[in-house]
Regions:
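Repeated loop/turn-to-beta-strand initiation elements of outer-membrane beta-barrel proteins
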Residues: 25-28, 79-81, 125-130
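Outer-membrane beta-barrel "beta-signal"
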Residues: 68, 154-166
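Residue-level signature of outer-membrane beta-barrel architecture
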Residues: 20, 73-75, 120-124, 140, ...
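Surface-exposed, polar helix/loop patches in the mature regions of secreted/periplasmic/lumenal proteins
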Residues: 70-103
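Exposed loop/turn and edge beta-strand positions of beta-sandwich/beta-sheet ligand-binding modules
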Residues: 12, 65, 81, 112-114, ...
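Flexible, solvent-exposed loop segments that connect beta-strands
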Residues: 1-7, 33-64, 91-110, 142-158
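Short glycine/proline- and aromatic-enriched beta-strand/turn motifs that initiate or cap beta-hairpins
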Residues: 1-23, 27-28, 165
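Membrane-embedded beta-strand positions of outer-membrane beta-barrel proteins
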Residues: 16-18, 30-32, 67-69, 83-89, ...
Length: 166
């Protein structure tokens, strides 16, 4: 949202999460994700200092790697259809990059990460060995970075996850 550096929709990412139910409705676990957003910028001239400038087209890229603790409240733990609400908290590594022909300018940074989500796991059999997982989420990270004349102050995304649960 409101991110001019790299604001295009992207499917380049993955998410893994594992948890343990400490009580029947509440689980605690860990997660790791990665995601990349890219945006093409037409040729333009950018001032680098008071006496120099760069003229080039650019490919902006923001790579994000959040990881940390995952918490989930399961509404119906005994059912084959298990709706839940959850939150993930942790650290977020990111790399903000601008590619210009044969040159790359980048800023690597760290921030705090939070991601609330709602979802459902639908098991194929009553034994709950394997199922389909779907979730909607929003995430925010406090990462800050600068590349050339561009800057970011916080990263946020929303998305939908579709995967397998076992």
């Amino acid at each position: 949202f409101s991110q001019d550096f790299s604001d295009k929709t992207s499917g380049w990412g993955a998410h893994a999460e594992a948890g343990y139910y400490v009580i029947p409705n509440f689980s605690v676990g860990a997660f790791i994700s990665y995601h990349t957003n890219n945006k093409y910028i037409d040729r333009q001239t950018l001032p680098v200092s008071s006496t120099s400038a760069i003229t080039s087209d650019q490919q902006h890229s923001i790579f994000q790697l959040p990881f940390g603790a995952a918490f989930r409240y399961n509404v119906a733990p005994e059912s084959q259809f298990q709706p839940y609400a959850g939150v993930q908290l942790g650290a977020s590594y990111s790399e903000m990059s601008t590619y210009m022909n044969v040159m790359k300018v980048y800023d690597r940074n760290w921030g705090f990460y939070v991601s609330p989500e709602i979802g459902m796991t639908m098991y194929f059999t009553p034994q709950k060995q394997i199922g389909l997982h779907v979730a909607a989420y929003y995430n925010y990270a406090t990462n800050k970075g600068e590349v050339l004349s561009y800057s970011i102050d916080g990263l946020n995304n929303w998305g939908i996850r579709l995967g397998l649960a076992f």
